[in-house]
Amino acid sequence: MEDRQNDQNDDVFSFFSPSFSAATPSTLFNRSAYSSSSSSGDDESQPSVDDSNKRIDYMIQFLDRRLSEDGNHDGIGDGNGSDSLPEFVGKCGESGIFKVPIRSAVHPNRPPSLDVRPHPLRETQIGRFLRTMTSTERQLWTGGEDGALRVWEFSELYGSGRGLEVEDTAPYKESLGNEFGSAAVVCMIGDEGSRVVWSGHRDGRIRCWRLRGDHGIEEALSWQAHRGPVLSIAISAYGDIWSGSEGGALKVWPWDGALGKSLSLKMEERHMAALAVERSYIDPRNMVSANGFANTLTSDVTFLVSDHTRARVWSASPLTFAIWDARTRDLIKVFNIDGQLENRPENSVYPDFGSEEEGKMKVTASKKEKAQSSLGFFQRSRNAIMGAADAVRRAATKGGFCDDSRKTEAIVISVDGMIWTGSSNGILMRWDGNGNCLQEFAYESSGILCMFTFCSRLWVGYSNGTVQVWDLEGKLLGGWVAHSGPVIKMAIGAGYLFTLANHGGIRGWNVTSPGPLDNVLRAELAGKEFLYSRIENLKILAGTWNVGEGRASTDSLVSWLGCAATGVEIVVVGLQEVEMGAGVLAMSAAKETVGLEGSPLGQWWLDMIGKTLDEGSSFVRVGSRQLAGLLICVWVRHDLKPHVGDVDAAAVPCGFGRAIGNKGAVGVRLRMYDRVLCFVNCHFAAHLEAVNRRNADFDHVYRTMTFSRQSSSLNAGVAGASFGVTMPRGGNALGVNTIEARPELSEADMVIFLGDFNYRLDDITYDETRDFISQRCFDWLREKDQLHTEMEAGNVFQGMREAIIRFPPTYKFERHQAGLAGYDSGEKKRIPAWCDRILYRDNKKHLGAECSLDCPVVSSISQYDACMEVTDSDHKPVRCVFSVKIARVDESVRRQEYGNIINSNKKIKVLLGELSKVPETIVSTNNIILQNQDSTILRITNKSEKNIAFFKIICEGQSKIEEDGQAHDHRARGSFGFPQWLEVSPGTGTIKPNQIAEVSVHLEDFPTVEEFVDGVAQNSWCEDTRDKEVILVLVVHGRFSTETRKHRIRVRHCPRGGPAKNHFNDGTKTSGQINALHRSDYHQLSNTLDVVEQLKNLHSP
């Protein structure tokens, strides 16, 4: 983990990185349909003139740097210019936690990424962070805290953002947010059948969205679904929408009811339709309340996933799971995270079936019983009370409180019908479709926040920003740090796995990664660095002063900072001993325990320094932190503020018991031009002989300083609170790869330490020191400096740099006594010393390194001195001016270059051609006729010799067959769901090479249709008895490819007792085409009716 980076290379570390080149070859999505060059508009198909001019500017700058290199390697300094001061460099900075973090144009320890939305500054996202994401065939959709939706067309992924919300983001369309009272988007799901996206919101509403070309995003339908927030949403194999909320609330919105009809209405007609949809839901809990399960279904429904393999729906809370039949909405099983069945009431009349039987059982009542089981007010109240009592009972049984580290945080279903759940302790669990836990895996102790499956792979996103890739057998294929923050959502499209980070950044990763494509793409992209990188130049003024509990005059502040701030872009000020005393220290410790910071005296200092810097006109304060007598603050120029953000603060006490703030450090971290800069103000142990304690103080600060958002009134409004994701550390589990995390300071591109380090002069007397000072023989004095001695030995400030000191020692003076005669002349006659220092570390691995994406932050020192004329304290203030070069990436140009490589590179084209193959498959029939609860076997043969085929069966729509035998009134179904009278099992699956898969196509007798109002069945009527026809589509994928082979199978439903028409509506001869395999060819399994009869017999006399 020693190469963790910030977001350009983005806080990347080599968590788990097998050789990409040695990975198994895989199939990539066909991107030709999505490349930016396929767009019809000229603005979309060609890079803009501005982008071309940028490339020219970057190339010229690159050539200028190369031409000037020859003259920059002389002298003691680091080669950043003739005005740079020579520097002293500490030892032992080449390894361990003091090693410079790895940076490069394309990081070597992770696959190249497509930055769809580069990491935005947190301060620009307050109240509008992206929180969820889904994809359709041609778009990537996201939802935010403000209720707004953003949509990226896959055809524009490589395009320029042209000054949108985030400058370097890919082009996108956006809906309106809070302007129209919309609440935060909590969950989303794409519906390919209806070509819409459904979203659940914090205000309890479900909304339906369409993309209308140039008109942007249109809200097609909206209704109040729940009283509380819509926490989860799923679409079943039958096209019904399932939604979950707080307190176990679960509702089903049938596609065959008002929902499906409403989408075909005109906009002005949809208001009344929304009212009908709102009342058309089914509450599946009402249908099972009598059997004893409902009392366990009281936890928030945080997850809903549709099992298309078995036509089921899984609902989940953090600790329990429930499995439902997607067609009948009957409850099948309830169990907890240990796989144990939830207890039913002791007086339950129902038997306790074994785990195998549980997989087949469907606890239900007959349709007649359902209609009669409408619950009145008292019955529902009784159930609520019983549910609460049962929850208390179960909590008491389990010890009252659950282990938060075991909570379920993500759940997905893979194409082979296996269910995968991830918990907050990093444990990944594999379940079969009947709810039996098969295996547990753990390779990472950080919490799992999201997962995604497609064909043969499973992707897992963690709270530490890591993404792992697994196969469906549980084998770990690779992993890397995808973002600098938690990965909260995933989606797939256009050949990429898209990951959404908690900070709002979106990246696309090749679905074959780790794979052979990565090395080619990495080399090509790195070779074009000069086209998309540029150098920014700025100056930083850092000042430190131990103020000795005093207050400075305006003249002193102007002398120290006012003049030096001219021409600098960033000012960092660290103060020590702002206030001391036992009472102050005790109060500070008490405040820290409750999250309070700052003091009136600290605020006075900030205001006075702000006035000196002309705060408000020239500078703006971006961050500060106070711990007892330690205070640090950072100001930046107004014109630089748009490029500065993600400001965090930290404090580390080093006083008594590492708990009191009389000694310690405070720090501020910020991100500028996508690089991380840290500023740390320290006050270490005093006294001449306490060298080891000072070294230990530094080591403690360096290793333990952890930054967090600021809450202090000293920085009000700078970094407000927002919807966040915690990053649980989780205990180690068996098999977890445990690698010691690098300190946060180790990951910064530049760290500046300033403060009263308290290092003194050794082996010299007071009088000798005064003589050397009067003669300005600082070279002799530096040989006695404890800090340089310890740095030379590699004991402290390892690998850090300091300009050669050419000013008198800054401690200790008599207050208000000018000149060098002011040194302590009292009884103690403390030996003068350079206690007040400023040191730094940038990205340079060696002296003379040039600024580039491999070494993105390079600094030198142009001024390092003390203000000897200031007499307000027993210490003199010290200041240092840094000349900093920062290499930054133009993500818009880089994204275009990425697209050019993908679409034109010959090696990549050859790889794609070899890898993007779909196995050849054949089906046993193209036409099926069903009647009288018929069942037919559809056989699918994989003719490939070596490649696995992945299939899914969908329904394109349903038609009515008229007397002439022709299909009419074709209607699409939501999410390509099956009609209620048809059961297809399995709906998804895998077929090994040269193997055959059998799919059961079964006619379910469904003579009546019920109308539900407010969750209760109200009316029923006979179903239309005319013949029906559906078009089933068998969609076959290769291992990774969305390029597909499709087979269409016509399935005709004839009413019971009616004649079977032997002609189809395609106008072709059908004799010899119909190949309906009858029930004798099908092994009949027990069904719902069998279980119902068994249950009814239990009550028979």
Swiss-Prot record:
GO terms for biological process: phosphatidylinositol dephosphorylation. Residues 31-54 are annotated as: Disordered. Optimum temperature is 22 degrees Celsius with Ins(1,4,5)P3 as substrate, and 22-37 degrees Celsius with PtdIns(4,5)P2 and PtdIns(3,4,5)P3 as substrates. Predominantly expressed in interfascicular fibers and vascular bundles. Expressed in seedlings, stems, roots and flowers. Expressed at lower level in mature leaves. Residues 749-765 are annotated as: Catalytic 1. WD repeats lie at residues 121-162, 180-219, 225-263, 403-432, 433-481, 483-519. It comes from the Eukaryota. CDD domains: INPP5c (cd09074). There is a cross-link at K907 (Glycyl lysine isopeptide (Lys-Gly) (interchain with G-Cter in ubiquitin)). InterPro entries: Beta-prop_IP5PC_F, Endo/exonu/phosph_ase_sf, Ig-like_IP5PC_F, IP5, IPPc, WD40/YVTN_repeat-like_dom_sf, WD40_rpt. It catalyses: a 1,2-diacyl-sn-glycero-3-phospho-(1D-myo-inositol-4,5-bisphosphate) + H2O = a 1,2-diacyl-sn-glycero-3-phospho-(1D-myo-inositol 4-phosphate) + phosphate; a 1,2-diacyl-sn-glycero-3-phospho-(1D-myo-inositol-3,4,5-trisphosphate) + H2O = a 1,2-diacyl-sn-glycero-3-phospho-(1D-myo-inositol-3,4-bisphosphate) + phosphate; 1D-myo-inositol 1,4,5-trisphosphate + H2O = 1D-myo-inositol 1,4-bisphosphate + phosphate. Its EC number is 3.1.3.36, 3.1.3.86. Its cofactor is Mg(2+). Coiled coil: none annotated. SUPFAM superfamilies: DNase I-like (SSF56219), Putative isomerase YbhE (SSF101908). Keywords: Hydrolase, Isopeptide bond, Magnesium, Metal-binding, Repeat, Ubl conjugation, WD repeat. It is an enzyme of class 3 (hydrolase). Residues 31-40 have a biased composition (Low complexity). GO terms for molecular function: inositol-1,4,5-trisphosphate 5-phosphatase activity; metal ion binding; phosphatidylinositol-3,4,5-trisphosphate 5-phosphatase activity; phosphatidylinositol-4,5-bisphosphate 5-phosphatase activity. Belongs to the inositol polyphosphate 5-phosphatase family. Has phosphatase activity toward PtdIns(4,5)P2, PtdIns(3,4,5)P3 and Ins(1,4,5)P3. Has a higher substrate affinity toward PtdIns(4,5)P2. Required for secondary wall synthesis and actin organization in fiber cells. This is Type II inositol polyphosphate 5-phosphatase 15. It comes from Arabidopsis thaliana (Mouse-ear cress). The gene is IP5P15.
